[in-house]
């Protein structure tokens, strides 16, 4: 009986324990932690000053009781700690960055990573937008930044980096719309004095080149002039005005043989008020109210004068910057359809590195692709002597280098090179290292006009092809402006300049040029040496890689060959310019 009683008590206690009767322990349901947090928009690009569409979270698992974010969201944006919704109006331009949102409850948490970019407020596509990019020169630059070399008056590695990084920022200013026109300083109108000589101002063209290649233009390409081909390129207008009068030497600028009113650039000295005439007259965009994005690249002296004169001539009475503010500032006169104008100022806040741009590897050639030639041929009879009256230089080497890729089809041309060519141009310092060591570098004056394709263009691509090389090697770039390249006498006059007079005796010269002009130059030189049968071969239109070498030895004997090449595989270059 006693054992049965105790058994009953034990069973009763067990029952009470598990059923919760009598105030004993109860069962507890443990909540789950949240999981799989995500947002409606994981990668967001916002505009400064424009309210965003609220970005809402979703998650699975347990209910979320609080949200937090790290680091803090861009100024003007907030995260609701109770709902996790991101909302607000961005108050400042912010570079692309990652933000981690944490959703929590009492038993755990989960995270999601968002990428947010806040871009500038773009200019209105309904307005006439005159956009001024201030290039640096020796007089107006931030000395602490070191963007301009005091010995070459050219950009430094850091200045080149800034120009490459400025291009996508300028795209944001345009609201990612295509540019309508680009106008740059005519380099020979602004010679800058350095300890080693007076050199043309190429910074304005180089500053805007990457931006030009991020735009596109469609041009006729077939013989009928109707079929359109679109390329990653945009023409840079940097030619002399119709009223331009070449200064007397120095510097000597040949009177232009071809004028292209639509190709006019900016004159540093604003000769005859040509800069204002370009904007208010030649373009005709203000009077006719032609909306678009018109970009001007020039140093502060030219830019500030042009801003002031446009404001005065058009009666805008704008409050303009009183002094140079640095290379990161961009100014825009935005003219509404009503005719009212406002000045919009942008600051890119760029802080580029001081090293040469690091690029992905480009496709290389294992061997030079051109069919070899040499004049005189190996083992031939001794070369003939120079003609009477022709006194050649001695101990001189000149490398003939073609511009970068420029023709997506054979007859397509805009005076510039295309996006693929930027890979070659930027890679030249590496590609040519150990192959050549020039003491001087020359190219065609980009203000000269080339008749190509179905129009006329400023011929900027040879000089811009070699610009990265001279920047990387801290060499000045000389512009050959004293001969009009399309004159019938151009080959003879060019040879006289480079191969006689002893100016280049003992020198090694890199000459960036037009490939169709090299054979006539060599043939004219061969005639000066009384060659009667041997001539230079044609340079193939699809060959951007070969280098011709002209050598004058210690007594002036001539040899010409094409044994060298840059070694870059043109066919494998990306169609779009590299973006850093």
Predicted regions and their residues:
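Bacterial Sec-dependent N-terminal signal peptides
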Residues: 9, 15-38, 115-123
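A short beta-strand segment in extracellular, disulfide-stabilized domains
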Residues: 49-59
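Short, solvent-exposed loop/linker segments at beta-strand-coil boundaries, enriched for Pro/Gly
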Residues: 63-66, 70-79
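Strand-loop-strand motifs at the edges of beta-sheets in extracellular beta-sandwich domains
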Residues: 75-91
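Exposed beta-strand face motif in extracellular beta-rich ectodomains
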Residues: 95-99, 507
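Extracellular and select intracellular beta-sandwich modules with Ser/Thr-enriched
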Residues: 108-114
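Active-site-proximal alpha-helix that buttresses catalytic centers in soluble enzyme cores
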Residues: 124-284, 303, 308-502, 518-580
């Amino acid at each position: 009986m006693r054992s049965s009683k105790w058994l009953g008590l034990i069973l009763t206690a067990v029952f009470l324990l598990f059923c919760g009767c009598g105030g004993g322990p109860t069962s507890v349901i443990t909540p789950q932690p949240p999981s799989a947090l995500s947002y409606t928009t994981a990668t967001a690009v916002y505009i400064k000053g424009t309210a965003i569409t609220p970005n809402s979270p979703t998650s699975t698992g347990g209910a979320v009781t609080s949200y937090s974010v790290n680091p803090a969201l861009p100024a003007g944006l907030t995260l609701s700690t109770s709902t996790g919704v991101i909302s607000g109006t961005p108050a400042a331009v912010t570079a692309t960055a990652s933000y981690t949102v944490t959703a929590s409850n009492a038993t755990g948490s989960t995270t999601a990573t968002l990428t947010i970019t806040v871009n500038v407020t773009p200019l209105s596509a309904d307005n006439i937008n005159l956009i001024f990019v201030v290039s640096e020169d020796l007089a107006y630059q931030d000395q602490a930044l070191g963007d301009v070399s005091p010995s070459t008056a050219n950009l430094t590695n850091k200045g080149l980096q800034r120009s490459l990084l400025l291009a996508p920022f300028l795209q944001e200013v345009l609201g990612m719309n295509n540019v309508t026109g680009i106008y740059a300083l005519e380099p020979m109108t602004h010679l800058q004095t350095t300890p080693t000589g007076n050199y043309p101002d190429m910074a304005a063209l180089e500053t805007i080149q990457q931006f030009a290649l991020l735009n596109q233009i469609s041009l006729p390409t077939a013989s009928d002039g109707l079929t359109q081909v679109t390329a990653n390129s945009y023409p840079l207008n940097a030619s002399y005005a119709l009223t331009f009068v070449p200064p007397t030497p120095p510097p000597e600028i040949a009177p232009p043989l071809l004028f292209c009113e639509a190709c006019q650039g900016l004159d540093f000295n604003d000769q005859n008020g040509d800069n204002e005439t370009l904007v208010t007259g030649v373009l005709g965009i203000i009077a006719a109210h032609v909306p678009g994005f018109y970009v001007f690249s020039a140093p502060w002296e030219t830019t500030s004068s042009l801003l002031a004169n446009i404001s005065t001539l058009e009666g805008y009475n704008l409050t303009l910057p009183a002094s140079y503010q640095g290379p990161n500032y961009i100014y825009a006169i935005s003219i509404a359809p009503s005719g009212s104008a406002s000045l919009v100022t942008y600051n890119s806040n760029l802080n580029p590195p001081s090293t040469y741009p690091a690029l992905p590897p480009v496709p290389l050639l294992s061997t030079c692709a051109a069919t070899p030639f040499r004049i005189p041929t190996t083992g031939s009879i001794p070369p003939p002597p120079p003609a009477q009256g022709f006194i050649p230089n001695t101990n001189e080497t000149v490398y003939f280098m073609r511009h970068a890729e420029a023709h997506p089809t054979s007859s397509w041309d805009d005076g510039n090179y295309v996006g693929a060519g930027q890979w070659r141009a930027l890679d030249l310092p590496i590609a040519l290292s150990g192959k050549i060591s020039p003491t001087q570098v020359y190219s065609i004056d980009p203000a000269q006009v080339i008749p190509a394709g179905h129009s006329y263009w400023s011929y900027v691509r040879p000089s811009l092809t070699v610009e990265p090389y001279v920047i990387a090697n801290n060499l000045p770039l000389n512009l050959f402006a004293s001969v009009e390249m399309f004159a019938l006498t151009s080959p003879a006059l060019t040879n006289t300049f480079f191969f006689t007079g002893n100016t280049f005796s003992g020198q090694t010269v890199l000459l960036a040029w037009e490939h169709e002009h090299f054979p006539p130059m060599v043939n004219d030189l061969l005639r000066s040496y009384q060659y009667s049968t041997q001539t230079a071969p044609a340079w193939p239109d699809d060959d951007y890689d070969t280098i011709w070498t002209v050598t004058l030895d210690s007594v002036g004997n001539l040899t010409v060959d094409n044994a060298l090449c840059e070694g870059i595989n043109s066919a494998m270059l990306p169609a779009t310019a590299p973006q850093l």
